[in-house]
Amino acid sequence: MIDALMANILWLVFIIIGGVLISWSVHFVPVGGAPAAMAQATGIGTGTVQLAAGAGLTGLVSAGFMMNVTDNLPLILASGAVGAMIMISVTMIVGTWVYVYGVGCVPSSAKVKYDPITKYRQDLYVSQGTEGHGLPTVSFVSGVIGGLLGGIGGALVYYSLIEVGLTAGLSTGTSSGVTGHELVGIAAMFAIGIFFVNAVIPSYNIGGTIEGFHDPKWKKWPKAVISSFVATILCAIVAVIAISQLGGI
């Protein structure tokens, strides 16, 4: 057991880094929850975990497809990042269409007087009794950054788990040689599990809604990152030991 951990110490570290990136990324995603679904809060009208998982798991799938072509880590991470960024961007764009053309409200933030990016006035367009609505430019940019970090984190976790399996002798050759192998399934299950753990922890930190990096709640991210660091260590140890032991079957 100790030998398995020491033999995969590099991948163990990469899994932990990936988990921390996932946790940090959640704080960038504009989450509006139920109030946003009724256009009474800025952000996307669903929960933290759903948005983070949707973007991050898309990045994980993108990384998996890239591993069919190459085992180059930077390219795999880039693929994961782009996949997650596209996913969250499309979600925010479609949400904005609904808010603007369906509900008929102007995307605006109640957390700041001026949009930090466009410098447009915000408070004049916030409807009375609401905490903003829609997705102003700063929230959109923040969400894309969140997708970038989450995609890289998810891809890094998945790639590392695949390499742990290869080290254990579950397959030979490069990562592209594991397509269709049982290793893909077991690595994906552990990667998804680690992703959800690190998506849930920031939810307690955020406590409902967050507009992006301009929201005062964003400054709480160090607490969630530290908690996710500890949680990911435990998850990584279990995952590495479990996958390593499969090499003897």
From Swiss-Prot:
Pathway: One-carbon metabolism; methanogenesis from CO(2); methyl-coenzyme M from 5,10-methylene-5,6,7,8-tetrahydromethanopterin: step 2/2. It comes from Methanosarcina acetivorans (strain ATCC 35395 / DSM 2834 / JCM 12185 / C2A). Its EC number is 7.2.1.4. This is Tetrahydromethanopterin S-methyltransferase subunit D. It is an enzyme of class 7 (translocase). Keywords: Cell membrane, Membrane, Methanogenesis, Methyltransferase, One-carbon metabolism, Transferase, Translocase, Transmembrane, Transmembrane helix. Its main location: membrane. It catalyses: 5-methyl-5,6,7,8-tetrahydromethanopterin + coenzyme M + 2 Na(+)(in) = 5,6,7,8-tetrahydromethanopterin + methyl-coenzyme M + 2 Na(+)(out). Belongs to the MtrD family. It is found in: Cell membrane. It is a multi-pass membrane protein.
